[in-house]
Amino acid sequence: MRHDSEDISLLVVHNISLPPGQFGGPYIEQFFLGELDANQHSFFKVIAKMRVSAHCVIRRDGEVVQFVPFHLRAWHAGVSSFAGRAKCNDYSIGIELEGSDVVPYTDAQYQALTELTQALMERYPHITLPRITGHQYIAPLRKTDPGLV
């Protein structure tokens, strides 16, 4: 639970593909739900016990899948800070684009991200254009996603 859902003031865009560089399939959902079978792929052995989540994933076809209600905390940012404030999970919403740093996102993803962002900005007025950022900017020594969105 967040201390104060009215404090939601940051939107963080990420990317994810499981296995890395591969799109489609059930693995992202399984990962966020803690149900990823480590035996399905060698990379999964590294991440299967991790407990992470995002509020939503936007698939390659533009489908938005929500995992965590927006007023609750998701575990997407890790060790992070924005504008001098640490612990971005406490006050942000995390959106994952199914993709990678080196493969362009689809038009359908951009459209869905635009619509979702507009709705979130209406619901959470402290999320303004300067407070929409990529994971690489809140955790610059650890992360490179979402790349050049």
Indicate where each model-derived feature is located.
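Basic/polar, cationic surfaces and motifs that engage anionic cell-wall
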Residues: A86, Y91, S100-V149
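N-terminal catalytic cores of peptidoglycan-degrading enzymes
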Residues: M1-A86
